[in-house]
């Protein structure tokens, strides 16, 4: 199978993970069922969603090698570490405020949520970028990261933010104006610069494609 097509087909696994997360809404209608199955379904959905991020870089594909690969590997380690930190810190803060159901009763604007509105998603994106770079997986860097970003933006724009706007109104709108969605501007500039650099290296043949 073409390695690019194989990377794209990982989207099927992402969708299964999202489907399990959607099932949580069914369990929420039955408090007893949610207590028994809710946590298991949520964790299974997260595990399945993370599978392409972790496994796709091991598929046959073009690799960044040599000194260039070592340099990007360092960037990947830093990005992955930051991603894990974001996920852990944001999850602990959410658990503290919202409880085991992870449904906040009011808008969370303190701590890491005062820096970015969706810090768990920020962490997932940083981890996806970093893990691909650690293994020098050029197709995963572009394709898997692209899929993850599109899915998370879709969840934010079409599901989560409309719900927050409906229930919290002006309070959420003010928070949205004040706090960036995923990345502060300097970090966004660094990520864009990284992507452009990768594109230039591919275009000039410094990173060969198979």
Model-derived regions, located:
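Short, amphipathic, aromatic/basic-enriched membrane-interface segments that mark the entry/exit
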Residues: 108-119
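Membrane-anchoring alpha-helices and their flanking helix-loop junctions
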Residues: 1-109, 123-210
